[in-house]
């Protein structure tokens, strides 16, 4: 669930994808090669259509630096994912077995340590000052390139108003490390 919108009027990496009938906005994390991408369907009820084409949503987009009027909701996502069964299905079984586990490289002898569980906790908080991810990295949204026009001249901005459900994902270089959706907005 999300609440209050906050507004930006500045330069962003932006893309309009007619095949997906959606707009894409890139919010770079300061000082890192990581960014959050927001995929906003052009239609207010277009989230299901985007989800049905998720591979295309996650594919690289043809971003250009555009002057935008952006309105984003504040939202917070917290999740805990149990990985033990997934890891076992992938063949990582011995580390969970008391008689076969060999974690002697960490401490003690073979059999002294065993993995009892594996969890992944994720925390994303989008607020007016920026994005906090995994409760460890604080970022501020800012333009990534200098404006191609003199500072006194501002072209008419394009609109990116996230007032309906959308998909977001965080990528490091070309790898998606987290994805989610905002499906309910309160105004």
Give the label of every model feature segment.
Residues 1-187:
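Secretory/exported precursors with cleavable N-terminal leaders
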